Every structure is written in C-alpha cells, then in structure tokens.
C-alpha cells in the first residue's frame, strides 16, 4: 500500500470538490476540506474547516500539505474575489510549504 499523503481541497461540500475528496479518501489519503458550507463528507480520514476563503484572516493554520487543490468557485457578483483573489491567497498560504508536491487549480462554469 502507498504511503498516505495530506491533500487540502477547497470547495468540498458538493460537486467536483466533493468527488475529488472522496476519491483521495478511497485511495487511503488524509483529506482536509475548506468550504463555506457545513461538511457533507463523514470519514475518519477527513477533516473540515468551515470558512470563507475570500477572508484571508479566517483561513485555518494547516501544516505539511502535500497536494493543494484550489476548487472553490462561484458565479455571482463576488466571482473575482473567490475565483481569482482567494485562489491566490490560498496558494500563498498553503502552496509554499516544505512538503508540497503539487498544486492544481480548477475553474469551471455551467
């Protein structure tokens, strides 16, 4: 079995982010989710932080992230604040860590 890695994903309460989180959990990895909504994933290897990623000061302290997946997004009057500015702030906070392996930025619209 592969060694467990620590994956941080934004926007894990529904849609693409939830599916990605569930995939990494099935593979035996530790997943940390950040979302404005309450958790929708209940798994022993999952922890959830409920906050608004556009508020940099509210981002939790999380160390030793190995994979960062910026998935949170919106289509409303705040889309630049979430889809661009928050992505940059999240990457600055978690993407420049000693153990980081990969950063994936996801953008979608329907």
Q: What are these regions, as identified by a protein language model?
A:
Residues 7-11, 34:
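Conserved N-terminal Rossmann-fold NAD(P)-binding element of oxidoreductases
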Residues 13-22:
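N-terminal Rossmann NAD(P)H-binding glycine-rich loop of SDR-like oxidoreductase domains
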Residues 27-41:
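Conserved glycine-rich Rossmann-like NAD(P)H-binding loop of the short-chain dehydrogenase/reductase
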Residues 43-56:
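Rossmann-fold cofactor-recognition segment
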Residues 66-67, 101-106:
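Conserved catalytic-site loops of classical short-chain dehydrogenases/reductases
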Residues 71-76, 107:
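Conserved NAD(P)H cofactor-binding loop of Rossmann-fold oxidoreductase domains
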Residues 91-92:
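A short, exposed helix-loop element centered on a Lys and neighboring polar residues
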